[in-house]
Amino acid sequence: RICYTHKSLQAKTTKSCEGNTCYKMFIRTSREYISERGCGCPTAMWPYQTECCKGDRCNK
């Protein structure tokens, strides 16, 4: 599986991952939207939210 693996304001990067899922973890604050992308499907702790998906580059 090929997943995006970058944080909010960084240039987009991809990585070939062993697992079958990619994730996008994010938090919305009053001033900005912060996100992080990577391989797998980690459990998010409040106030973060995680979206997991299966498919190459699905975590845009």
UniProtKB/Swiss-Prot annotation:
One of its GO terms (molecular function) is calcium channel regulator activity. SUPFAM superfamilies: Snake toxin-like (SSF57302). Expressed by the venom gland. It comes from the Eukaryota. One of its GO terms (cellular component) is extracellular region. Its main location: secreted. Disulfide bonds join C3-C22, C17-C39, C41-C52, C53-C58. Signal peptide: none annotated. Keywords: Calcium channel impairing toxin, Cardiotoxin, Disulfide bond, Ion channel impairing toxin, Secreted, Toxin, Voltage-gated calcium channel impairing toxin. Belongs to the three-finger toxin family. Short-chain subfamily. L-type calcium blocker sub-subfamily. This specific blocker of the L-type calcium channel (Cav1/CACNA1) is a smooth muscle relaxant and an inhibitor of cardiac contractions. This is Toxin S4C8. It comes from Dendroaspis jamesoni kaimosae (Eastern Jameson's mamba). The lineage of its organism: Eukaryota, Metazoa, Chordata, Craniata, Vertebrata.
